[in-house]
Amino acid sequence: MEELLHYVWKHRIFPLNELTTTTGQRLEIIDTGLANRDAGPDFFNAKIKIDGVVWVGNIEIHTNSSDWFKHGHHQNPVYNNVILHIATCVDTEVHRSNGESIPQLQLDCPKHIQENFKELANTDQYPPCYRIIPSLPKLTIHSWMSALQMERFEQKNAHLIERLRYCNNHWEDAFFITLARNFGFSINADAFEEWAKHIPLRAVDKHRDSLFQVEAFFFGQAGTLSDPDGDDYYLKLKREYVYLAHKFELSPMDITRWRFLRLRPNNFPHVRIAQLASLYHRSYGLLSQLMEKETIREIRDLLRGGTSEYWSNHYTFEGCSPDGPKTLSESSLNLIIINTIVPFLYAYGIHRGKEKLCSRATGFLEELRPENNYIIRMWSQCGLKVAHAGDSQALIQLKKEYCDKRKCLYCRIGYEYLKRR
């Protein structure tokens, strides 16, 4: 109920005329303030008028006014700037830590909002607000999608900066971990990230001219060269890895971290590792090269690559496949661009103050086709137009950060749903 009161107050869904405090003072709401999701009062810098006197300060909201004392606000100086206390049930007076009384407003949550909120909270449908999607103004949808896209950019930027710190501010290292994670797609993302953290890129750089040695590094650190027996190529890689592991004091990851069940041969970790080995063998300073590419076609051409000859007819060291190149599909390339290249362009642009890179990142999303997954299909079935990857990224953000967390009160579509009668 308290969350709903926050919503009602923030959006002024209550009669604004002839408001009075619980002691009969005339009350006018000029500005409801800025919502605070952290510790402290619920709304900052509100502006109200009581009996003609303007007050600027904070707002605190409770279901019962006695909650003020239960939460210890009467002893906390942080709440001394509260100028209005709001409660559905006013069962006591409240005061600041210095004993001063605080004006109170008795505020009910309208019945239709309570009923609409229960509908959203109790439905198993996704999206829960599907009924109103076709009736929403295009401007409402467009502005919310734009905000969600930027929110996703900022969230990914924060994650990348954390990864950059982990890599001691080596952008190439952070990029390699991110790229590897996305080469694992949904099934092996965590395993690929762990694997990438086992790869000593400075050591790999010293042997980068040899694809065979890069493969020895990559497959050895993946834990895939532990069997004593295998074909000639496997045994050569194993011997090379033993030499490199001794030279650079390497230890491989646990091979059981890899998942193989229900994977197509071209999606097996071995194939993805071989593709990454080929990419790093032929693309020194990969991140720098990608930063210079101005078109999606150029990026695709750089990433597409292939593998060494051995992998043209293998998907593991034991498993053979029909002879043919093992290149990334168009849809896989698009996902890697969306989830790796675009976020890095944006993060690097922010970090270096290069607006051009940020604009290029957002522009790439508008050029790429939207992702095709359950989330996007469900929204499309509701009548929402998903035109490009920027839209699909916005909807993924909406699902993960609002729908899954039941944060309908903070969603603009949720706002439209709740206020309907």
Regions found by a protein language model. Give the residues of each.
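N-terminal "leader" segments that precede or initiate the main folded domain
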Residues: 1-6
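N-terminal ordered "arm"
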Residues: 7-64, 79
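Catalytic micro-motifs at enzyme active sites that drive phosphoryl/nucleotidyl and oxygen chemistry
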Residues: 32-37, 45-50, 68-75, 90-96, ...
